[in-house]
Amino acid sequence: PEIVVSGGALPWRDAAATEADAAVRFLTDLGVPANRILLESASLDTQQNAQMTEAILRTRGARKVLLVTSALHMRRALAQFEQVLGIEFIPVATDHEVAADPPGLIRWLPDTDALDGSRRALKEYLGYWAGR
């Protein structure tokens, strides 16, 4: 099997490194042979990830693909990849987040983690509806 990693250099992050480069480093650190990793490092959003990955998957005759991304991002990624490629994707969500609310009244106080979660969720909702 081969692994396709997709993601370009995001303007608000370190421009020298792409998301795909970071994924390659992670996978090789885990022991995945570098010659089994296929790189797409030009895309800047999920729609472009799907479009630019299409050529890689088509040349290899892929019919069924595991789509690995964060749990929060999976709905949007799956919709866009299925729309662009029209092949079967099996969703493999990572980094599920589960947290218990603190007891008592403290749970009603403002919290930076909650604000970050709201920001990430809003980004996914907007991205999902914009990508339709």
Predicted regions: what is each one?
Residues P1-L109, A114, S118:
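A structural signal for short, hydrophobic/glycine-enriched beta-strand patches
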Residues S118-R132:
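A transmembrane-helix-recognition feature enriched in membrane-embedded lipid enzymes
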